[in-house]
């Protein structure tokens, strides 16, 4: 929505980036996920680094794209509380993956993703609910969506 050009590719990554790939959207969503629900709280969570008109337009676009919902909690002046929709909540795994990637590859690591019980870093794994098994990375394949129906069981 915000990029001057949209990715035209028939690719989940490209189409997801068309929705959340601008400079601010993921940070706004992460702020909401972290409990910052009002405009002022979201703005402050971004340390005032975003122009207010840009934040307003991003919030409207994220709502139009079905990632957040708004609830009017004050009429004069109108003020909204923002919450994640189920589609927005599904980005939590993306945020966690970015934290893990950052811990491994950034020169300065700011956050870690840990298991609360033992305080050690976790790893990501893939699970097949059909087979009820953890799946190794070398056993994964990305296939065209229509091919999903033709896979053997």
Placement of each model-derived feature along the sequence:
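Short, Lys/Arg-enriched N-terminal segment that forms or immediately precedes the first helix
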Residues: 2-17
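N-terminal helix-turn-helix DNA-binding core of bacterial DNA-binding proteins
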Residues: 13-54
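Basic, amphipathic "hinge/linker" alpha-helix immediately C-terminal to the N-terminal HTH DNA-binding motif
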Residues: 21, 74-96
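Alpha-helical linker/hinge and terminal dimerization helices associated
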Residues: 26, 65, 94-105
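Residues within the helices of the helix-turn-helix
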Residues: 40, 60, 80
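Canonical helix-turn-helix DNA-binding module
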Residues: 46-70
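C-terminal regulatory/oligomerization modules of transcriptional regulators
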Residues: 100-153
């Amino acid at each position: 929505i915000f990029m001057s050009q949209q990715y035209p590719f028939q690719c989940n990554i490209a189409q997801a980036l068309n929705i959340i790939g601008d400079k601010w959207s993921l940070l706004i969503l992460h702020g909401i996920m972290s409990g910052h629900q009002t405009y002022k709280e979201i703005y402050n969570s971004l340390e005032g680094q975003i122009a207010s008109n840009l934040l307003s337009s991003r919030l409207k676009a994220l709502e139009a794209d079905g990632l957040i919902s708004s609830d009017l909690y004050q009429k004069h002046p109108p003020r909204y509380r923002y919450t994640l929709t189920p589609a927005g909540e599904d980005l939590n795994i993306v945020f966690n993956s970015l934290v893990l990637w950052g811990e491994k590859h950034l020169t300065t690591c700011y956050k870690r993703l840990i298991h609360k019980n033992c305080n050690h870093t976790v790893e990501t794994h893939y699970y097949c609910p059909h087979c009820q098994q953890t799946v190794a990375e070398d056993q994964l394949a990305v296939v065209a969506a229509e091919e999903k129906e033709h896979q053997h069981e």
